[in-house]
């Protein structure tokens, strides 16, 4: 028939805890990637020209961490969405703290790689958990929300991070740390009572 599928709202109580538990890492990733060129120059004492290739390597380390987790390690772990999201957000909080305080480029690289690993756990956990939280007819609606969650933070993070970095170098990382900490707390407390499997069968 021509009946439209049911609309899924951001405020749906089946979905909202998953969104609250992940948005911090999306914002943090935007901050890290948009400020990496500045970090390389400031903490490595490099001129703009040689900093370009180092910045590319830092971003590659971040992507490598995410790919390693999603393609190789994650499937072998066999963890459910909630466990993946919690582990990813906890690691993100640790990695971002280390990146905020990193005194050398080697420390920046290690922290950036760890942020990629964290994303490689948290993002699939969120996507799977939010998808399982709704029924089959709502899958189209939830797919849009899943993709839009990251997109919205990517609109805000680059602009705000650049402005904040120009004001006080540590400020965008401190804001990101607060959001990651909030999301990490949500992943442990708000998701505690959710029965993902039963929601999917409704």
PLM segments and residue spans:
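Short amphipathic helix-loop junctions that connect adjacent transmembrane helices
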Residues: 34-54
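Helix-to-loop junctions at the C-terminal end of transmembrane segments
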Residues: 68-81, 165
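Loop-to-transmembrane helix entry/capping segments in MFS-fold secondary transporters
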Residues: 52, 134-146
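Pair of pore-lining "gating" transmembrane helices in MFS-fold secondary transporters
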Residues: 12-32, 113-114
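Symmetry-related core transmembrane helices of the 12-TM Major Facilitator Superfamily/SLC fold
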Residues: 172-189
